[in-house]
């Protein structure tokens, strides 16, 4: 009886370890080879989240972590680096003080930003991670966040 229980527990542990290894070593999604869900103007994307956050979240974001791949077009308002050394481009309407779209590049695609200057019109492909938000009580704004970005044009 004890050997049957021991064998059953061993089989369950082996299956669990196999599943964990499968999940751990599964290849990451290649955003640049994935077909884009839509091409959107940066200001239009921000306005969608500000007008109806729930509808925009349902359209662009996925609770399972497979958020949509978008191509965002807009005017470069700012170029910076984050704490990890990844370059970040803020796409924003120059005449608008509202939020914009923050596009974070990977270390592999950082070099694509070298020839881009503030004021340029660009198309950037990436995964949307968060929508624009405005907190009236604290007067705080949050840009739309696009990760794993790459310049298209």
Task: Describe each model-derived feature in a short phrase.
Residues 2-153:
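OB-fold and OB-like single-stranded nucleic-acid-recognition modules
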């Amino acid at each position: 009886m004890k050997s049957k229980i021991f064998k059953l527990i061993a089989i369950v542990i082996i299956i669990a370890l196999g599943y964990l290894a499968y999940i751990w070593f599964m290849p990451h999604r290649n955003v640049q080879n994935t077909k884009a869900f839509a091409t959107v103007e940066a200001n239009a994307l921000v306005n969608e989240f500000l007008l109806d956050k729930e509808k925009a979240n349902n359209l662009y974001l996925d609770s399972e972590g497979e958020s949509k791949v978008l191509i965002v077009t807009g005017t470069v308002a700012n170029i910076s680096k984050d704490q990890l050394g990844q370059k970040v481009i803020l796409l924003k309407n120059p005449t608008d003080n509202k939020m914009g779209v923050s596009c974070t590049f990977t270390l592999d695609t950082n070099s694509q930003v070298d020839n881009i200057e503030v004021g340029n019109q660009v198309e950037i492909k990436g995964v949307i991670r968060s929508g624009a938000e405005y907190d009236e009580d604290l007067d705080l704004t949050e840009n739309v966040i696009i990760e794993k970005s790459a310049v298209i044009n």
